[in-house]
Structures are given as C-alpha cells and as structure tokens.
Amino acid sequence: FDLYYRGKEIDFSNAKAKELLAVLVDQGGREISLHEMAQILSDGEDDETARQAVHVAWSRLKKTLVSYGLGDIVRKGRGFYALNRRRIRCDCWEMLEENEDRYFMGEYMPEYSWAEVTLSYLLQKFEEIKTRKIREA
C-alpha cells in the first residue's frame, strides 16, 4: 500500500500510521469506530493499550498528512475515524465504479493480512468484468 501526491510517494515514518490509513482506504470512506480500529491494528495488546496505540497512530498519520498539505483527506469524529473519499483516488475503487479491469493488477495491500477479505472480493469482481468484456467482444 502506497500513497502518492503529485507523483511522489508519501513517506510515512510510522508503520502503524500508514496501516491506519490503509484500513481507512480499505473501508472506502466508511466510518470506523475506535474499538474496531483498535481490533484491526492490535498486535495482541489489551483493549486499552490497543486504543492508545490507535490514538498515537492517528496523531502521527495526521502530522504526516498535514506536512504534505493533505490533512483533510482523513477525519476524526467522536469515537470514529474516516476517509474523505472525495479527496483521493484509488485504483480499486475506480475498477469497481467504472467496471474497468485496467485499474487492478491482482494485488491488494499484501502487507496486511486483514486485507485478504477485500482481495477475494476484488478478484471476484475482476473476473466478472473480464468475463463481461469477453462476452461483449
């Protein structure tokens, strides 16, 4: 998972901050509760430690994004985190919205085990799009 701005890759100095952003992208703009985010990002810590780790990761993520002028692509509300979907492009979203297979290359956030569910869904949709194109040809 990588994020680019004006053709350059954003440098995340903290892996958990980057993973938090990856979770938000994976959820496509859906609001994610602090509890749910803590479960996803947890490395087996107790709930309080996991929640504290989310707060730290959020702070670092926000600081990184602000340094690139991108602080508004994520938002935090009372007990939830979300992505401002209108402010970013994602190749997988484009594939799904436009029914075009050229956007998807068969990989999806391979560094995160929690992304395997979405990968299965994307592979299924990719095959459906290819099959439809073959039938239309």
Task: Write out the residue ranges for each language-model feature.
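Intrinsically disordered, low-complexity protein-interaction/activation regions
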Residues: 1-137
